[in-house]
Amino acid sequence: MGRLERQLMEAYIRQKRASPGMVQASDLQINRPMSGMRSNSRELHAYDGPMQFISSPQNPDQILSNGSPGGIAPATINTSRNHSNNMRSLSTINQEADLIEEISSHELEDEESSPVTVIEQHSAVHSANSTQSQRPRPRQHSFSDTLDEDDYTNRNVAAAAPVRPAGVPSSPYKEATLDGSSNGTGNGTGGESEGDVIGNIDQFVMQPAPQGVLYKCRITRDRKGMDRGLFPIYYLHLERDYGKKIFLLGGRKRKKSKTSNYIVSCDPTDLSRNADGFCGKLRSNVFGTSFTVFDNGNKESTESPRLDLAVIIYDTNILGFKGPRNMTVILPGMTEDDQRVKISSADPKQQGILDLWKMKNMDNIVELHNKTPVWNDETQSYVLNFHGRVTQASVKNFQLVHDSDPEYIVMQFGRTSEDVFTMDYRYPLCAMQAFAIALSSFDGKIACE
């Protein structure tokens, strides 16, 4: 593959990652080169597709290299009478369009791995515009017995980029947002504090977060080595001041398993079930639409049976609707002293979380949903306000809320670079539950996209 083809492929991947099926951060800005220009000499895009990102702004026939100064800018032409000779011929554009179509037919291993240019932050826009532009995707309720496309195919290409802040109001619950501030100002003066590790790591990761405390974490994906392209290792760290971090958990996918099965441990050097730091596991059904989180209990034991920590259900998409994933998370309920209700599907005397949810027995369980993203007509994409914690568009980006209070964000997860993701959580989740929910987002789902 030549230099031109490689550049066109990179531009195509950047466009594909910004497709309407992905969720972008709403607190970033997109430049509008055609706004405010109503004269005869206004600038128009010469290309309506990936070519506009790699063409020179001075010479439309020149292709910029990766190291060219000026960054990524759309090629433009001047429509004034004095500059009519600068118009590109229709045949040249058609030839380049054919070349783009030929290159785009090749699939890459991970179409979300190429970087996305981040635009600097600017002031917020009116929240009324966001309200009028909402376009949620229909929710499908079946989750277990249908086959569809895999995790990385059949996504439309659309010209979109990170957008400016949407002016999302703060949460009425404790007057707090996920940036730890009140009223959404981001000044850190709210009543919510940032959490720190208390006691031993193995005990801390299983304890529910105290009310009024926010834990800001980071997940890194290690794909180096012989087989880590298919079986990467994920590391969870608690972020601290001045770039410091504290290791909490590590997770990896088991190789010899009929379904997706992740081992989670607080020992980064030994990610096995027999390790002293083994904390639990995440197991999916055969379609990858339903995941169950277990602790490190013994399935056969009657004294300390294995407990259910969470169930994650992804809605199937057999009709091929374009839009973000829809997910439901079911957690054990909380007691008056802020401890989890013990539920075990391994105990024959009681029902598991999934069985209780199917029977609509909600007495001892809590149901969460991903927050519905807002459709932005300007960028032709779905956006959410991550308060600066997420910088790249991805189908994996999500926020979890309860239907009774959609402004209280229990957990949020999103991409910041190719193999780095932020994960923030608060009451009633613990680190183990939040990390397992994030791991389920990484796993391929043959019936969800």
Curated annotation (Swiss-Prot):
The keyword Membrane applies. Residues 154-166 have a biased composition (Low complexity). One of its GO terms (biological process) is protein localization to cilium. Residues 123-197 are annotated as: Disordered. The keyword Phosphoprotein applies. Pfam families: Tub. It comes from Drosophila ananassae (Fruit fly). Disulfide bonds: none annotated. Residues 183-192 have a biased composition (Gly residues). Signal peptide: none annotated. One of its GO terms (cellular component) is rhabdomere. This is Protein king tubby. It is a peripheral membrane protein. Its main location: cytoplasm. Belongs to the TUB family. The modification Phosphoserine is found at residue 142. Gene3D superfamilies: Tubby Protein, Chain A. Residues 124-145 have a biased composition (Polar residues). Keywords: Cell membrane, Cell projection, Cytoplasm, Membrane, Nucleus, Phosphoprotein. It is found in: Cytoplasm; Nucleus; Cell projection, Cilium membrane; Cell projection, Rhabdomere.
